[in-house]
From Swiss-Prot:
Other comment: Heme 1 (or BL or b562) is low-potential and absorbs at about 562 nm, and heme 2 (or BH or b566) is high-potential and absorbs at about 566 nm.
Annotated SUPFAM superfamilies: a domain/subunit of cytochrome bc1 complex (Ubiquinol-cytochrome c reductase) (SSF81648), Transmembrane di-heme cytochromes (SSF81342)
Upper lineage: Eukaryota, Fungi, Dikarya, Ascomycota, Saccharomycotina
Name of this chain's protein: Cytochrome b
An example molecular function term from Gene Ontology annotations: metal ion binding
Cofactor binding: number and manner: Binds 2 heme b groups non-covalently.
GO cellular component, one term: respiratory chain complex III
Cofactor: heme b
Function description: Component of the ubiquinol-cytochrome c reductase complex (complex III or cytochrome b-c1 complex) that is part of the mitochondrial respiratory chain. The b-c1 complex mediates electron transfer from ubiquinol to cytochrome c. Contributes to the generation of a proton gradient across the mitochondrial membrane that is then used for ATP synthesis.
Length: 384
């Protein structure tokens, strides 16, 4: 027996990375998992080095970031890798979620895999928001003020929760210090959840584009899919390097290069680009509590898919009707992100409300109805 199989610890690695049987029909969309793992490693590694030089004191936070950029050897590289790494993390995550929606990765027997993935998504958004606040530029300060104020919409205890989050009566030194603590902690929780994600995936193995059981035609991970993953890793690193070395501030916001000032409100308060769709949904609801519930509902509705999708065929590969509405949903989501950059004025308010309705209608109305129609068509075709 090979040593990698006889050794207790190497056998664990072997079963996940080397001899893990994968369906032979999986395409390059299945490579997003390895890219997300790479992004997580980049974020944790660069984050640890940044934490060595960062000061969480509100008076020194902005200056410490400038110190990293100017005085720390290769500090500019570490910071730009971390900031652009967050954007690439979300790009890969959105594509990964889109792949799961298109190919029905949420359907039984992989419901737990999907559920853990949604939890990872929520934690990643939390980590991104906390990290964005730590720079303590103008957008960091006002973003922290606006988002934490959302908890004041909770009846009876909302204001107490906001005061507890701030550690004071406004965003101040205790706020930044506790945000830094949680921002350092959450990535390790995400790493633990990723291990759980892999463990649950390992039970039934990966799905495939055909939507059928692939147990009859599988290949080992090493030698086939490891090399396939490396191809996309190299492509990823090329685009990542282009941003880090040639256009590092493109995905950021110019107002965040101004020190935070609670006495001056920016012309437009917007989060990072990867949170814009959810910000649009929040702004589309006139009622504060309703907007908060709707915003959190945009993520939690993903957990409803295993229930609302009643199709007997996994994935949209052979379903024309589902394909059309899926790409309509993707277009709508991109439009939500674009509307998040716009000011709250006519016609963007109405457009945001329409896009919000379409977003929820896809999961709660269109998916159940379309799956029922396609099931009926499938049965009628079989009878012929």
């Amino acid at each position: 027996m090979a040593y990698r199989k006889s050794n207790l610890y190497l056998n664990l690695v072997n079963s996940y990375v080397i001899d893990s049987p994968q369906p032979s029909s999986i395409n390059y969309w299945w490579n997003l998992g390895s890219l997300l793992g790479l992004c997580l490693v980049i974020q944790i590694t660069t984050g640890i080095f940044l934490a060595m030089h960062y000061s969480s004191n509100i008076e020194l936070a902005f200056s410490s970031v400038e110190h990293i950029m100017r005085d720390v050897q290769t500090g500019w590289l570490i910071r730009y890798m971390h900031t652009n790494g967050a954007s690439f993390f979300f790009i890969c995550m959105y594509i990964h979620i889109g792949k799961g929606l298109y190919y029905g990765s949420y359907k039984s027997p992989r419901v737990i895999v999907w559920t853990v993935g949604v939890i990872i998504f929520i934690l990643t958004m939390a980590a991104a928001f906390l990290g964005y606040c730590l720079v303590y530029g103008q957008m960091s300060h006002w973003g922290a003020t606006v988002i934490t104020n959302l908890f004041s919409a909770i009846p009876f205890i909302g204001n107490d929760i906001v005061t507890w989050l701030w550690g004071s009566f406004s965003v101040s030194n205790p706020t930044i210090m506790r945000f830094f603590t949680f921002h350092y902690l959450v990535p390790f929780i995400i790493a633990a959840m990723v291990i759980m994600h892999l463990m649950t995936l390992h039970v039934h193995g990966s799905s495939n584009p055909l939507g059928i059981t692939g147990n009859l035609d599988r290949l080992p991970m090493h030698g086939y899919f490891i090399f396939k993953d490396l191809v996309t890793v190299f492509v990823f690193m090329i685009f990542f390097s282009l941003f880090v070395f040639f256009s590092p501030n493109t995905l950021g916001h110019p107002d965040n290069y101004i020190p935070g000032n609670p006495l001056v409100t920016p012309a437009s308060i917007v989060p990072e680009w990867y949170l814009l769709p959810f910000y649009t949904i929040l702004r589309s609801i006139p009622d504060k509590l309703g907007g908060v519930i709707t915003m959190f509902g945009t993520i939690l509705v993903l957990l409803m898919l295993p229930i609302t999708d009643r199709s007997i065929i996994r994935g949209n590969t052979f379903k024309t009707l589902s394909k059309f509405f899926f790409f309509l949903f993707i277009t709508n989501f991109i439009l939500l992100g674009k509307l998040g950059e716009c000011h709250v004025e006519v016609p963007f308010i109405l457009m945001g409300q329409i896009c919000t309705f379409i977003y929820f209608a896809y999961f709660l109305i269109l998916v159940p109805i379309i799956s029922m129609i396609e099931n009926i068509l499938f049965y009628l075709t079989n009878k012929k």
